[in-house]
A protein has these predicted regions:
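C-terminal domain-tail junction helix/linker
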Residues: 178, 185, 189, 211-269
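Basic, flexible linker segments flanking DNA-binding modules
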Residues: 2-103, 198, 259-266
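Acidic/histidine-rich, metal-coordinating catalytic segments
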Residues: 161-176, 195, 256-257
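An active-site-proximal beta-strand-loop segment
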Residues: 97-137, 143-144
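RNase H-like polynucleotidyl transferase catalytic core
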Residues: 72-77, 168-171, 186-204, 220-226
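Generic alpha-helical secondary structure signal
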Residues: 2-6, 22, 149, 179, ...
């Protein structure tokens, strides 16, 4: 003889299972907003911002149980030949991989990344990141990499570059052009260039470019050539920059967004 009440009890979900279900829905809502890119640490930080104080172990367990884990970006292997001496007449690697700064506007890093468009061409995005706040402080898109493309990027930095600001890039043709160096000099900035062929010298902004593709483009469009016009790809770049600055919390900033962190430190100074 089987006790009927014990059968019903075994079929009834436990309180823990019910709580997990509710909790999983909260996590799912956050993952949907952030394109499935929040890992355990950032998810825990985001939940706390919403007043939900939980142990990161529970977050990890529920994320795994409900298959809500983040999209993992594969670590890139850097194969770089290192040329220690820059070519004659060019600025050296003044930044020297010191990727931190005490104040906004002290150190800026820049790079151009490219994204495919439906006509077989590319959407080039020129981005500048502040090493203090982690904010993207300039973003320009174009159909080709010209000197003017680089100058337009500098125009966006009006008021953000101060005398002595370090401006670091790789040795791309835009950045080694005398007119670009002169424009920086006129703004009072100190130019710094990566060593030839050494991607690690500009790792922070190169990492951002990879993160943008992994968090924003690939989840929505997959890899390969996308069926989007230049204007559509360009719009997505600007949307990601806004999201990255204003909504995406960062562990190294104490789980604040880049914009929140800048406001906090400028109020304290």
């Amino acid at each position: 003889h089987v006790n009927r009440s014990s059968v019903y009890k075994s079929l009834k979900p436990s309180q823990r299972a019910l709580d997990d279900e509710v909790f999983a829905q909260q996590i799912k809502a956050i993952q949907l907003k952030h394109k499935g890119c929040y890992g355990v640490d950032r998810m825990t930080g985001e939940l706390r911002r919403k007043g939900i104080y939980v142990n990161h172990k529970r977050v990890a367990r529920v994320m795994k149980l409900y298959k809500l884990n983040a999209i993992i970006r594969k670590k890139r292997n850097y194969f770089c030949d290192v040329e220690q001496v820059p070519r004659k007449g060019l600025p050296g690697n003044v930044l020297n991989r010191k990727f931190s700064a005490e104040k906004p506007g002290k150190k800026l890093v820049s790079d151009v990344t490219y994204l495919p468009t439906s006509d077989g061409q590319w959407c080039y995005a020129s981005l500048v990141k502040d090493l203090c706040t982690s904010e993207i402080v300039a973003c320009v898109t174009g159909k080709s990499q010209t000197l003017n493309f680089g100058i337009e990027t500098l125009k966006q930095l009006d008021g953000k570059i101060h005398p002595g600001t370090l401006f670091h890039t790789d040795q791309g043709s835009i950045y080694t052009h005398p007119a670009f160096s002169y424009a920086l000099e006129k703004m009072g900035a100190v130019q710094s260039l990566s060593r030839k062929g050494n991607c690690l010298d500009n790792a922070v902004i190169e990492s951002f470019n990879g993160t943008m593709k992994c968090e924003w483009f690939y989840p929505q469009l997959g890899k390969g050539r996308w069926n989007l016009s230049f204007e559509e790809v360009s719009k997505m770049v600007f949307e990601y920059v806004k999201y990255y600055n204003e909504e995406r919390i960062q562990k190294k900033l104490g789980y604040l967004t880049a914009t929140e962190y800048r406001r906090q430190i400028t109020q304290n100074h």
